[in-house]
Amino acid sequence: MTRGGRVAGVHEAHGGHRALVVTASNRASAGVYEDKGGPLIAEGLRGMGFAVDGPQVVPDGAPVEAALRAGIAAGYDVILTTGGTGISPTDETPEVTARVLERHIPGIPEAIRAYGREKVPTAALSRGLAGVAGSTLIVNLPGSTGGVRDGLAVLEPLLRHAVDQIRGGDHPRPVEADPAS
């Protein structure tokens, strides 16, 4: 499989739940060091039963927004990002994510920060967001492997239910009014 490539037919075997992993890192995208968070997320998502594409390793900022928009257009159920959520001048992932979200889900990043803060007080500095764009759930995770593990621990009991809810799950979708009536 190529970086960010897809294996045909894999998502059908996973109940149709498809996920994309995007790593936001100026240095990893330039080859300065290896992305460790993205593969960890991909492994975790596979363990949850998702067919996973990526990680796509891109510089922070506009390339992250482009990857999110492409993932939404491709119909992924979930897009998890890692990196770019801190407070350094180059951390722009929350800002570009906010531009694509239609509905915010503040409880998810709050839970991730609270979970991480129990072990590492600086987890409170993460500015990650979560929300829905189209029919895609997007969640920003920190760039550290510890932050990724914390995020996956919080997401594991939530993701499949969230995807089912976004799809209409146990709640009927609104019926459009018949213009003839």
Residue ranges and their predicted role:
Residues 1-181:
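Non-catalytic beta/alpha edge segments that cap or flank active sites
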